[in-house]
Amino acid sequence: MNLIHFGAGNIGCGFIAPILSSIVDHIYFVDNNIDIVNKINTQKLIKIHTSDSKKISITNISAWLLTDFINYKKTWNEVSLLTISIGIKNLKHIIYYVNQLIDYKIKNNQKLIIMCCENGIRVSSLFKSYFSNLNNNIYFVDVLVDRIVSNKNILNDYLECEDYYLWIVDKTQLPSDFKQVPNLTYTTSFDIQITKKIYMLNALHCSLAWFVFKNFSFNKYLYVYQALKNDKVVEFVNNYLNEVILVLNHKYNINLDELNNYKNQIIKRLNSNFIKDDLKRLARNTELKLSKNERILTILDYAKDNNLKHDILLLSYQNGLEYLKNNK
């Protein structure tokens, strides 16, 4: 099995490639950056250094310029998986090219699985809505992905990423005869997994940034791991996650052991100084994050309506409002 991946940036090379390179025979990257395409085709090598001191070399790769995509039809027979990491707002720019691949697969009665590995909710399903020429051989499968990859220039000698990664697949959207790809996690309760990540990890990120800004300022703590050396910050993180866990257990009946294990995993990642996670970055888009039906108010409102402990959730919302007021 071969793989086509749209996006030869840090996520494509630092996340997708090291996870799938040992599973597929070959990875064809597609990108519109000629320097990256030339580097991959010349060196035939991607080097990865992980937070656990692992060094990974990926050699079963080549790259195509986006505008040359149609010229490589001769390789498409062996491609059964298409993955994408170009940013949700850029998906519209590859519709034409993906459509050509879909038409080819339908014409030749071949299966194709498409996974949008983007930071969003059910992005593959969203991408599917852009196409009308589909049949039962084309599968858009939603995934939940998470891995911190350094913002090092992809043209450097190597990329850095944390050893941890999350790649959860909605099993219900796969063909019944699909042979599961190793290194991925398959679930029939995909929405529950999304819920955990949004309200425990994503919401904590911005809440932590607002808390540090209010109590210490970003001049004292620039990165997450630095702030986690302060006992007051550690206490906030623990109390925040404990209140979220109460809500998720009450609302979705998610097992407490599962939630607490995820909490411990989050805290371990926050404490790592291998990848420097910028607090200012985590505080971005505050107005959106404070809006109704978003990561903060959804949990806070449920806790209040059901008489669950919510002191820290409320504090976080107030911190966010203060940050917004000072950073318009």
Swiss-Prot record:
GO molecular function: mannitol-1-phosphate 5-dehydrogenase activity
First-level EC class: oxidoreductase
The entry's keywords: NAD, Oxidoreductase
Origin organism lineage: Bacteria, Bacillati, Mycoplasmatota, Mollicutes, Mycoplasmataceae
Cellular component GO terms, alphabetical: cytosol
Entry similarity comment: Belongs to the mannitol dehydrogenase family.
Database matches in PANTHER family: ALTRONATE OXIDOREDUCTASE-RELATED, MANNITOL-1-PHOSPHATE 5-DEHYDROGENASE
Enzyme Commission number, as recorded: 1.1.1.17
Disulphide-bonded residues: none
Keyword Transferase: no
UniProt catalytic activity: D-mannitol 1-phosphate + NAD(+) = beta-D-fructose 6-phosphate + NADH + H(+)
InterPro entries per the UniProt record, alphabetical: 6-PGluconate_DH-like_C_sf, 6PGD_dom2, Mannitol_DH_C, Mannitol_DH_CS, Mannitol_DH_N, NAD(P)-bd_dom_sf
Membrane-spanning parts: none
GO BP annotations, alphabetical order: mannitol catabolic process
Residues the entry annotates as binding NAD(+): L3, I4, H5, F6, G7, A8, G9, N10, I11, G12, C13, G14
Species per Swiss-Prot/TrEMBL record: Mycoplasma mycoides subsp. mycoides SC (strain CCUG 32753 / NCTC 10114 / PG1)
The name this protein goes by in its record: Mannitol-1-phosphate 5-dehydrogenase
